[in-house]
Amino acid sequence: NSQSVSSEHFYLSDDELPRYFSAGKKHRMEAFYRKMRQRFAILMDSDGQPEGGQWNFDANNRNKLKASDLPSVPQPLVFSNDVSAILERLKRHNIKTMGQAHSSLLWPVNRQQAKELLDYFCRYCLPLFGTFQDAMTGRLKQRGNNRQWSLYHSRLSFALNSKIISPQLVVDTVLAHYRAQQGQLLCAEPRIDIAQV
């Protein structure tokens, strides 16, 4: 049995969702995304229109990584969190798991690490996140470089899903960084990241 409950972690409460997703109709995330931007005044101008004059820049995020782009791909910020005690506890209690676990976890495990990763994303990855959002490459591995495996992605989903940080914090931080760097970032970059959140 499962039960749905509301959480302050989300922008909408559980009982508000039916207003945005009527039963029996087809829905597009783009339409929902626009409604959320309007409701919460995210990247909207004073006339209620999207900043920059358009809702999305999806056509701009389908670029392929060329060999000349690879040297500028940032090395991901990773952590070295010792989880050996947790692994031992799982083993001691015969808890079955999927996959293979290592004694060092590279994901953030507390708010400080999650905020550090968010700040790192804004500083090093956000400027080209939109440009290469959908890009994939095996070239880095072919060159013996596994350090840049995450390309320009934030890798914040673990911190968000485990509620270490909130979507509100991510959106506010990305917007603050965008406003501070306005002349240097394409208008597309924060929109694309915010849509992902």
What is the predicted function of each stretch?
Residues 1-107:
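Beta-rich, aromatic/charged-enriched effector core domains that present basic-aromatic interfaces
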Residues 116-197:
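Gly/Thr-rich phosphate-binding loop signature of adenosyl cofactor/nucleotide-binding cores
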Residues 113:
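Conserved functional hotspot residues or short segments at active or partner-binding sites
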